Structures are given as structure tokens and as C-alpha cells.
Amino acid sequence: MTFFNDKTDGKEDWITPKSIIESLGEFDLDPCCSMTQPYLIGKINYNKNDNGLEKEWIGRVFLNPPYGNKTGLWLKKLSNHRNGIALIFARTETKMFFDYVWNSADSILFLKGRVTFLQPCGNLGKFTAGAPSCLIAYGEENTKYLKNSNLKGKFIKLCNNNYTIMEK
């Protein structure tokens, strides 16, 4: 789910493209599954009615949180869980990014170009996202998935405030 730009036709559910999911391996949990998800991402999937933010998270998580003023709460939960990948806007200057990415994540893949999310029916959206996106990895296993994925962009390994940038 997401609230990500002014070109959404008033819709709040936007689905991660399957090509992104397939390049990142299998996930145990998707805590932000759309009510009409055309394909499931996790072995367990919580939708809006389940309130995935309040549920217990287990295993490897894929998080495409609702975008807006509560995105930080979702990232905080994933940061504390320490096992998963989040897809968010690359808003590197925000408090949320400093608190739960720069100071907590293990790696980042800044995606080349802008993501075209899917509508809940499975069709591509009419527009690309309103900002660049990145994938945030928590845990070494998830860092390996990001690094070895076929997704184009810039991969950055974060460790003790030392950064290694790798062309992808």
C-alpha cells in the first residue's frame, strides 16, 4: 500500500511489481498486503483489516508500507525485527531515514529510475512513482539478496558508518 504522489487517482493501494519481489527471494511475511492483491508475497500476508503494524512479525519480511506520516512506524518495526527488506521512497534527508535506515539498516539498493507500481487489479499504474525508490535490507541474509539481485541501481553496504558503493 502507499500514498505516494498526486497522480494516484485517489487510490491508496499500489502493488510492488512482481519483478522486484522475484529478484529478492521468498518471504515469510508481507504485513502490508493489499485487500485485492493479485499475487501473494509472503507465506503469511496481513491486509489493512489485520493491522499488520500491531501483529507479531515472524521470519523474513517484505515491507512496502503505506506511504505518509506513519511510514516511520513501519520502518521502526522492521528495524527492530532485523530480518527483512523494505521498499520506500529514497527520502534520504528525512528523520525517518536517519533513524531507521542510516543508523539501523545493513544495506540499501537505490533503484535506477522510478518504479511503476501495479494497481490492485494487477495492471500497471498510469504513472511512475512520484519520487525515486530504494530497497532497505535489515540483516546479512537480506543484504546478500539485495547485492545479488538483478535489479539495477546503486548498492550501498552500511557498516559502522563506513560505506561501500557498488555499481549494479
Question: What is each stretch, according to the model?
Answer:
Residues 1-168:
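Class I S-adenosyl-L-methionine-dependent methyltransferase catalytic core
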